[in-house]
Amino acid sequence: MVMDTCLTSRAEHAGATTDHDPPVAGLSDMLCRLCDGSLKPKQLGVLGEQYAADWLERHGYTILGRNWHSRYGELDIVMMAPDRVIAFVEVKTRRTDHFGMPQEAVTLHKQTNLRRAGVQWLLEPDHRIRHTGVRFDVLTIVARAGMVSVHHIPGAF
């Protein structure tokens, strides 16, 4: 299978990063699976979150938690950024952007719940970690035939 591994972005945001580097071995395997049109939405979401975590690690982030649940909802990924800021990362994976950009699915209501869940995560005794700040990021993945677009928006809200 020939695959276009150029990762591009179609959204603009101050501080946003887009991957244009060729993927490393583990990410390359996930690229093929992300482009598999037979994946069910839940499978696509789980694979997208794994891809996002690996992508962020490749960019210097350290995983602190994954799929952490509170009464306000789930935090997809909690990471320590290279500048020692704790980043709560909401991942949105789609097959198309025909119905809008994936980040548009992070509504004001969702943002409020993510903030509340983030506060709860920080208050957990096991999560007392030296850090310089906190932010909420959105990382979007659009996977369509042969191409995966990754767009990371630090401090999205």
Residue ranges and their predicted role:
Residues M1-V24:
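Intrinsically disordered, low-complexity charged/polar segments
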Residues D19, P23-R66:
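Acidic-basic catalytic patches of nuclease active cores, encompassing PD-(D/E)XK
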Residues L56, L75-M79, D83-D97, L114:
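Conserved catalytic cores of phosphodiester-cleaving nucleases, focusing on short active-site segments
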Residues R71-E74, G146:
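Short acidic/glycine-enriched loop/turn segments that link adjacent beta-strands
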Residues G73, V85-A87, R135-D137, H151:
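Protein kinase-like catalytic core scaffold
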